[in-house]
Amino acid sequence: MAKYFTSESVSAGHPDKIADQIADAILDAVLEQDPKARSAVEVTTSTGDVSIFGELSTNAYVNIRKIATDTIREIGYNHAELGFTADSVNVSNKIVEQSGDIAQAVDNAEDDPDQLGAGDQGMVFGYATNETDSYLPLTLALSHRLMRKIRDARENEILPYLRPDAKGEVTVELDDNDKVKRIAAVVLSTQHDDEVTLEQLRADIRKHVIDEVLPQDLVDEDTIYYINPSGRFVLGGPQADSGLTGRKIIVDTYGGAAHHGGGAFSGKDATKVDRSAAYYARYVAKNMVAAGVADKLELQVSYAIGVARPVSLNVDSFGTAKVSEEKINEIITKLFDFRPLAIINNLNLRRPIYKQTAAFGHFGRTDIDLPWESLDKVKEIKNLL
């Protein structure tokens, strides 16, 4: 029986991703003035409306409405026919200050007063695979590339009739060793102007987007292409569907190839281990795989609120390790510090670097420079093997 695996991605103009980008744009603006600000901003989007709420503790002053409308405009919602535009949207701001109880627990770790405690309990996962140069599953890497390509086709007016909302999905067939054998199917749905015919859109998307992204040695005559399979897709974005921060956590991470602890990223400052520890776990997994420790590796790290040191750390190499599990744990324990303040300092996370991550994935990015994607520990790991 054939074995398949699928991942998806969405465009920057997807309603949930609009919300994520606004939340991280607010975070970045605050961090520019106040690197130690605490943020847990949430955003909803709907027809003609953006609601911003959550918690923010900072000495900075930022223009929330302007940040939201500038972000919407940058994404491409700037024409009245889209039903959701930067110039007409209503922005409501209901942000409040962070709970004092949470603040004191974070500022004074129970197990180490000189360290920050975790901002909440919970578990995070980090993952890497040598399946691609980006150390992401091929299905997710290709899905993200499809979404970036369709954005470029719209912004560069190669396909000027495209609108900002889009989704993509790639399915591969695997061999008996779980290696990619071929691309079995591609699904791509994109919003478009009313005038374009479905026939033209499908031909253009195949030529200018899909065929320019997919590795031709992995497609064959049996590869299936579903381009706008629902047909008409004129109404899209928040005019058609409401959006909310944190609803694309699998798109943001590993495309379903690894576990997820449930915590979202956007709008959260680095004291929130949902974000910072997940980034650090990716950093560890990527460096370990790049050093040849295993073909793929997943870390689970768990925390207690107000406590600096992790409650637990578990490693799974899926049977691909080149050394013993004991050796892997020994290397990780020796080289990597999972306490929140150590993570913040090691990755320099008190900077306005987050908005750029809020679309097209937080990991495996080759178009932007992210500290948790650095391979600066590979040499040290190899020296310990």
Swiss-Prot record:
Note accompanying the cofactor annotation: Binds 2 divalent ions per subunit. Binds 1 potassium ion per subunit.
Keyword Metal-binding listed: yes
Binding sites annotated in the UniProt record for Mg(2+): D16
Subcellular location: Cytoplasm
GO cellular component: cytoplasm
Keywords for the protein's UniProt record, in alphabetical order: ATP-binding, Cytoplasm, Magnesium, Metal-binding, Nucleotide-binding, One-carbon metabolism, Potassium, Transferase
GO process terms (BP): one-carbon metabolic process; S-adenosylmethionine biosynthetic process
Binding residues annotated for K(+), in chain numbering: E42
Family annotation (InterPro entries): ADOMET_SYNTHASE_CS, S-AdoMet_synt_C, S-AdoMet_synt_central, S-AdoMet_synt_N, S-AdoMet_synthetase, S-AdoMet_synthetase_sfam
GO molecular-function term, one example from the UniProt record: magnesium ion binding
PANTHER family per UniProt: S-ADENOSYLMETHIONINE SYNTHETASE
Known role: Catalyzes the formation of S-adenosylmethionine (AdoMet) from methionine and ATP. The overall synthetic reaction is composed of two sequential steps, AdoMet formation and the subsequent tripolyphosphate hydrolysis which occurs prior to release of AdoMet from the enzyme.
The protein's name: S-adenosylmethionine synthase
